[in-house]
Amino acid sequence: MSQVKLKPKKKYGHIDGCVRCGRKRGIVRRYGLHLCRQCFRETARQLGFEKYS
């Protein structure tokens, strides 16, 4: 018999923490970013966000 490889189960819903540093509080989930607010401030320019005021 041939070996059947199972794929890991895909996780749906909220991500546990920031994908960059792992922090659990202050998560920015809008547009699928999943960054904490501190990491968002550090990387916003590279992501294409501009500050107008």
Curated annotation (Swiss-Prot):
Query: Is Oxidoreductase included in the keywords of this UniProt record?
Result: no
Task: Summarize the protein's role.
Answer: Binds 16S rRNA, required for the assembly of 30S particles.
Tell me the gene name. Answer: rps14
Q: Name one GO cellular component term.
A: cytosolic small ribosomal subunit
Q: Which domain of life is it from?
A: Archaea
Q: Which SUPFAM superfamilies does its entry note?
A: Glucocorticoid receptor-like (DNA-binding domain)
- Give me the comment on cofactor binding: Binds 1 zinc ion per subunit.
* Pfam families in the cross-refs: Ribosomal_S14
GO process terms (BP) = cytoplasmic translation
Query: What is the originating organism of this protein?
Result: Thermoplasma acidophilum (strain ATCC 25905 / DSM 1728 / JCM 9062 / NBRC 15155 / AMRC-C165)
Q: What is this protein called?
A: Small ribosomal subunit protein uS14
UniProtKB keywords:
Metal-binding, Ribonucleoprotein, Ribosomal protein, RNA-binding, rRNA-binding, Zinc
Entries under HAMAP family matching the protein:
Ribosomal_uS14_2_A
Q: Which molecular function GO terms apply here?
A: rRNA binding; structural constituent of ribosome; zinc ion binding
Family of this protein: Belongs to the universal ribosomal protein uS14 family. Zinc-binding uS14 subfamily.
- Subunit note: Part of the 30S ribosomal subunit.
Concerning InterPro entries, the annotation shows: Ribosomal_uS14, Ribosomal_uS14_arc, Ribosomal_uS14_CS, RIbosomal_uS14_euk_arc, Ribosomal_uS14_sf
Residues binding Zn(2+), per UniProt: C18, C21, C36, C39
User: What cofactor is this protein dependent on?
Assistant: Zn(2+)
